[in-house]
Curated annotation (Swiss-Prot):
Keywords: Ribonucleoprotein, Ribosomal protein
An example Gene Ontology molecular-function term: structural constituent of ribosome
CC per GO annotation: cytoplasm; large ribosomal subunit
One family name in Pfam for this protein: Ribosomal_L33
Gene coding for it: rpmG
GO annotation, biological process: translation
Cited InterPro entries: Ribosomal_bL33, Ribosomal_bL33_sf, Ribosomal_zn-bd
Name of this chain's protein: Large ribosomal subunit protein bL33
Similarity remark: Belongs to the bacterial ribosomal protein bL33 family.
Amino acid sequence: MAAVTIKVKMESTAGTGYYKTTTKNPRNHPEKMELMMYDPKVRKHVLFKEKKVK
């Protein structure tokens, strides 16, 4: 059986252009992810929203 995980880009909402890549299983989590993560450009924890990897 093939893997169903997809790569997603988590982009900072602080407007710095900083992003991280991660994977998710769309069968378990079909909605877009939103996580609080550290943005080193602003030196704070900010909200990261899921974007599509190109």
